[in-house]
Amino acid sequence: MRFLEGTDILVAEMPKSVFADMQQASEIAIKNKITHNDPAEASIRQEYSMQCPNSFSDWILLLIDHAFEFHKLRYGIATEGTQNLYITHSWVNVMEKGDQHYPHMHENSFYYFSCYISCTNDDAPFYFIKDNKGTKVDINKSSEGHVLIFPSQMIHTVYPKKTDGQRVSVSGNIIIRP
């Protein structure tokens, strides 16, 4: 796990068993096709609601508690352990050639995550926008099994996918409960 230099963006690799659980959960969500209700102007074409497996929830919440002093120091929210962290909802994204995700943020949560299930080489990059500057995160085949975690008020976007093949990712919002 590491923070991208000079940012609050954490990159971490999921344990193999957690990644396998996420692959299975995303396959079920894609099969069930329960539409995730993102605004049409911000959404890619294929987004489906899904339930994250307990193994993933336990892992990511513990990781956030250990890695981010953000909520403890910057906002004076005193939490010890994961009991106050909660994934409010999650969804699977399926990107095809030409798809993109317009700049947006997640106002009703504290953290956001995007974990990569299946990618192609030279896939559409993920960008963070701050002070009219972009921080690019390249996504490629080696991104599979990795997750980006960051404060949800950071504006982010996915550029148009120019490669053939699908990119499957799972996204979600995390809140801190009182």
Which residues does each predicted region cover?
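Non-heme Fe(II)/2-oxoglutarate
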Residues: 1-83
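Acidic-enriched, low-complexity/disordered segments with a strong bias for Aspartate over Glutamate
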Residues: 8, 21, 38, 58, ...
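Short loop segments at secondary-structure junctions
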Residues: 15-16, 117-121, 178
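Generic ordered-secondary-structure signal
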Residues: 41-57, 64, 93, 113-121, ...
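Catalytic core of non-heme Fe(II) oxygenases with the double-stranded beta-helix
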Residues: 84-153, 157-159, 165-169
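Short peripheral tails and domain-boundary helices/loops at the edges of structured domains
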Residues: 167-178
